Amino acid sequence: ASCLAKPVLYIIGDSTVRNSTAGQTGWGDPLVARFDPAKIHVINRAIGGRSSRTFLTEGRWDAVMAHLKPGDFVLMQFGHNDGGPLNDDRCRASLRGNGPETEDILRKTDGKPETVLTFGAYLRKFITGAKSKGATPIVVSLIPRNIWKDGKIGRSDQSHALWAKQAAAQEQAL
């Protein structure tokens, strides 16, 4: 059977999800080996340096949406690149939170207007988009950063991980 007859698991996210030629190893590529290729086709569309915002604004989500079909899955993990200034030489940060807040900017990178959303709002766009195609969205909280306090790894359970959990719950995603 062709891969089109099988369900497809699309993985979207940043460098923590995708291996790079620079020696970085994300969890998405090794995950592929855990699935039976006779039953499901896995496509890792994650790319280093991307945030939930830039995955959308660069057209990467549209490229996934163009191929989604009923029975597919979208596994998403963002957050590592969603912090920082909204309008710098990368224009990749999202607004903090999970609410409906927006901020209109003229991007320094190209002078174009953009309405920046909250982190949770971008995730909800991915979730509702996947569901509109009959696919199952799966939200994964970001892997912990290499930040230690008192001998323990720091958690983002009051920021991006929390907002991911809230967005998934709001839209009944896994």
Regions found by a protein language model. Give the residues of each.
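Serine-esterase "nucleophile elbow" of acetyl-processing enzymes
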Residues: 1-47, 62-74, 90-102, 168
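Short glycine-rich, polar/acidic loop-and-turn segments at beta strand-coil junctions
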Residues: 46-49, 80-82
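Structural motif
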Residues: 51-59
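Alpha-helical cap/lid subdomain in secreted, periplasmic
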Residues: 60-174
